[in-house]
């Protein structure tokens, strides 16, 4: 049974009693206790199920039962990759790596090597991400760190050490990498 919290009077109400409470409590809107989703007006009527107690407390460790997986497939809900049991993953994949997958791995390695060789300094890497559009340095650094691995992520101090700002005759500011 799904329970909701009235955000106006802070009462906890089970779903069958929500309509009654809504007529008594003026301007009431509700939040599902299990999934912390807030519902305006009568949107709560469509909310029939959400995460179970096991999902909420176990988070990444939770593995759904076969029954839950079947229900999700029947309802058309997308099941997260974390929720798939490891047995189903192993049954669908072939026993050994195929020649096609090995070729793709080799191509990926070559692409990574060529990317590392072409762009060397952090400033040049950031300038490559701008794609001739105006973007703040903060957003640019955030975008780079999102794409990069943890050991390749950049600190803002390091980036600023490698950048130089110049003004041209028109009064435009140009950001260039410092060459040593």
From Swiss-Prot:
Ligand binding (Zn(2+) 2): 32, 35, 47, 50
Region Disordered, annotated ranges: 61-125
Bias-annotated ranges (Polar residues): 77-95
Cellular-component GO terms for this entry: nucleolus; nucleus
Annotated residues for binding of Zn(2+) 1: 6, 9, 21, 25
Pfam family, one: zf-LYAR
Record key words, sorted: Metal-binding, Nucleus, Phosphoprotein, Repeat, Zinc, Zinc-finger
Residue list for modification Phosphoserine: 85
Protein name: UPF0743 protein C215.06c
């Amino acid at each position: 049974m799904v329970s909701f919290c009235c955000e106006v009077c802070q009462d906890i109400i089970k779903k069958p009693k929500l309509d009654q409470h809504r007529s008594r409590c003026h301007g009431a809107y509700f939040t599902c206790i299990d999934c912390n989703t807030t519902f305006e007006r009568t949107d709560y009527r469509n909310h029939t199920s959400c995460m179970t107690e096991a999902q909420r407390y176990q988070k990444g460790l939770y593995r759904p039962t076969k029954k839950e997986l079947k229900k999700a497939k029947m309802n058309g809900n997308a099941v997260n990759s974390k929720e798939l049991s490891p047995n189903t993953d192993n049954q669908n994949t072939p026993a050994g790596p195929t020649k096609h997958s090995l070729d793709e791995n080799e191509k990926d390695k070559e692409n990574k090597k060529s990317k590392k060789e072409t762009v060397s300094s952090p400033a040049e890497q950031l300038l490559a991400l701008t794609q001739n559009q105006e973007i703040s340095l903060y957003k640019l650094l955030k975008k780079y760190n999102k794409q990069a691995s943890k050991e390749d992520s950049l600190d803002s101090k390091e980036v600023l050490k490698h950048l130089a700002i110049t003004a041209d005759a028109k009064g435009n500011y140009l950001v260039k990498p410092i060459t040593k």
